[in-house]
From Swiss-Prot:
Positions contributing to NAD(+) binding: G31, A32, S33, G34, G35, I36, G37, D57, N117, I140, S141, N142, M251
UniProt-recorded name of the protein: Malate dehydrogenase, mitochondrial
Broad class of where this protein is predominantly found: mitochondrion
Residues found modified as N6-succinyllysine: K78, K91, K185, K203, K215, K239, K269, K296, K301, K307, K314, K324, K328, K335
Native species: Bos taurus
Lineage: superkingdom: Eukaryota
Record note on quaternary structure: Homodimer.
Annotated positions binding substrate: R104, R110, N142, R176
Name of the encoding gene: MDH2
């Protein structure tokens, strides 16, 4: 069922560069001057799906906007600087993407980012709740396992919460799983689709290799190694960059892919499926990432976990306590805010 609905990875990105796509989405990027924000803004500017691109950050946005505005594509670009300009950046937006926050450095986990990024996400999502309450909210800022509950609680506080419109962008886990499986099996990565469920940190990242299309088989030792590599791929990049940042280019690609899928669905395209960390009843965890059928109003249907192998079943059971703790941490943060 899922395999039939899921289009091959990257199809949305490729299609977004074709001229036949509808061209009307108003998209805001909050944290547009950062390591993810700049390449993400470039990919969004390059897409005919986007008609207006508004960029927000606390530094350098006028320069980033000026640079992007010289690109010969239809999207208009405007930069907004500092909290007093944030309301204007958000007005009339259909989609808001938030990569704002501090990146990981060697030796740090995504959870180490919590104290700084929790405040940033709470502040930015409060502005979204006030100035574009109907927009789709796509959170990239880590730790996603906590920043999505933060976003939900902030929207609840403002009385505008809609669980079908708040997404934790876990797409990079799927992109990596597709790339790594394709590499091992000598397949075209654009034709590989591996659902990745659970959360977006370490052991909570659960690639469902048993549901991969096309079907692939690995001996258990290779499967364990592959799963571990997908779970720790972010750390692999942090180490390789040796203190000069985290995964920015691949994250920008994954973020753009998710936005284009969402906009396609909002434009009425049928059968658009992406995994995302959202409010969920699929497990006893209040938030969980699974494949979602996207529609005009956000989540049309949660497609659930589906049939999993005993190895995957065990990973799900082990991930849930950690996920619950991260979720609670996010919820408590908002409850304790002044």
């Amino acid at each position: 069922m899922l395999s039939a609905l899921a289009r091959p990875a990257g199809a949305a990105l490729r299609r977004s560069f074709s001229t036949s796509a509808q061209n009307n989405a108003k998209v805001a990027v909050l944290g547009a001057s950062g390591g993810i924000g700049q390449p993400l803004s470039l990919l969004l500017k390059n897409s005919p799906l986007v008609s207006r691109l508004t960029l927000y950050d606390i530094a350098h946005t006028p320069g980033v906007a000026a640079d992007l505005s010289h690109i010969e594509t239809r999207a208009t670009v405007k930069g907004y600087l500092g909290p007093e300009q944030l309301p204007d950046c958000l007005k009339g937006c259909d989609v808001v993407v938030i990569p704002a926050g501090v990146p990981r450095k060697p030796g740090m986990t995504r959870d180490d980012l919590f104290n700084t990024n929790a405040t940033i996400v709470a502040t930015l999502t409060a502005a979204c709740a006030q100035h574009c309450p109907e927009a789709m909210i796509c959170i990239i800022s880590n730790p996603v396992n906590s920043t999505i509950p933060i976003t939900a609680e902030v929207f609840k506080k403002h009385g505008v919460y809609n669980p079908n419109k708040i997404f934790g962008v876990t797409t990079l886990d799927i992109v990596r799983a597709n790339a790594f499986v394709a590499e091992l099996k000598d397949l075209d990565p654009a034709r590989v689709n591996v659902p990745v469920i659970g959360g977006h940190a370490g052991k909570t990242i659960i690639p469902l290799i048993s549901q991969c299309t096309p079907k692939v088989e690995f001996p258990q030792d290779q499967l364990t190694t592959l799963t571990g590599r997908i779970q720790e791929a972010g750390t692999e990049v942090v180490k390789a960059k040796a203190g000069a940042g985290s995964a920015t280019l691949s994250m920008a690609y994954a973020g753009a892919r998710f936005v284009f899928s969402l906009v396609d669905a909002m434009n009425g395209k049928e059968g658009v499926v992406e995994c995302s960390f959202v409010k969920s009843q699929e497990t006893d965890c209040p938030y969980f990432s699974t494949p979602l059928l996207l529609g005009k109003k956000g989540i049309e249907k949660n497609l659930g976990i589906g049939k999993v192998s005993p190895f995957e079943e065990k990973m799900i059971a082990e991930a849930i306590p950690e996920l619950k703790a991260s979720i609670k941490k996010g919820e408590e943060f908002v409850k304790n805010m002044k």
